[in-house]
């Protein structure tokens, strides 16, 4: 998946509106958190057996909220000059040690409870 055109589009969108002045790490993080909360709201009070229908009926809104999350996350990564693939690789390696397969496979417990 080549995200370069998407990342460029996000950058251009913000530059055209002169929004970089507002996009500091604190505010981008707050915006990201708010968008995650809006995604959570799509599923609020739904029982497990209602989720399939909820997703089907609200797919466009769910997609829009996920897009908002991605936009703010990618913009935050750019502002902080983070190599996201490298950060993900590092975090996965860290989590491999915390969640060894033999203890965590099929288990939802936190690493401190394994």
Kindly give the residue locations of the regions a language model identified.
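Flexible "arm" and connector segments at domain edges
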Residues: 1-66, 70-114
């Amino acid at each position: 998946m080549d995200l370069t055109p998407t990342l460029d589009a996000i950058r251009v969108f913000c530059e055209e509106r002169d929004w970089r002045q507002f996009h500091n790490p604190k505010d981008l993080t707050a915006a990201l958190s708010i968008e995650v909360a809006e995604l959570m709201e799509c599923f609020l009070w739904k029982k497990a057996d209602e989720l399939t229908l909820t997703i089907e009926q609200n797919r466009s809104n769910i997609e829009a909220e996920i897009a908002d999350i991605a936009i703010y996350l990618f913009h935050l990564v750019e502002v902080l000059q983070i190599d996201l693939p490298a950060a993900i690789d590092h975090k996965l390696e860290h989590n491999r040690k915390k969640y060894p397969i033999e203890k965590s496979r099929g288990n939802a417990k936190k690493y401190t409870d394994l």
